[in-house]
Amino acid sequence: TFMIMGDTCTRACGFCDVNTGKPCDLDDLEPLRVAESVQTMELTHAVITSVNRDDLPDGGSAFFAKTIHEVKRLNPSTSVEVLIPDFKGDRGAIDNIIEASPEVLNHNLETVPRLQREIRTAASYGRSLSLLQYAKDSAFLGKTKTGLIVGMGEEFEEVIAVLEDLSQINVDIVTIGQYLRPTAKHRPIHRYVDKEEFVKYKSIGESFGIPHIESGPLVRSSY
């Protein structure tokens, strides 16, 4: 996984250990360096993610697109997955990603609707769901993907309701993993979810028609 556009985020989500503050200027050579790194490592699948860049008019979506194009130019047989922020719901920014044609467009819901305000700074469940639906309803030919972190205070039935929502908008891939607290300053772990519950999430999600679900304690959205 490559994280682009710096190491400083404009948001401060309760589960995340990325620095928050004023981000650096964009490095115009970074897309090429990412592409060269993919080439050097002979990757067959590359994941590109980023910090939130609410300081940029397009949220950094054009820079994302440039990186996708460079990776594909130097590595035509490599599939590209992007894990993107919500771009504040800006359809033009999302179009930049779609038009760059990644094989997988991933945007994480992270948690259930009730906990969104506590856990995801400046984001919302509805906006994220709309992003995924917009990609699916557009000319995007790749797969849509999202991830949930459990053990942060959600109830079993709330996760099932999210899976039902995702099935309604034809999301292709869902990951569900255990929350692990990065530091003592971050949101406490509410509980450790047992393996049987992860199995139930997978089984029920598949019964709703979701094609691919990875559900387990160590599952993470970026690989």
Go through each PLM region and give its residues:
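Structured catalytic core of nucleotide-sugar glycosyltransferases
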Residues: 2-3, 35, 82, 144
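Auxiliary Fe-S-binding modules of radical SAM enzymes
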Residues: 32-33, 39-42, 66-78, 92, ...
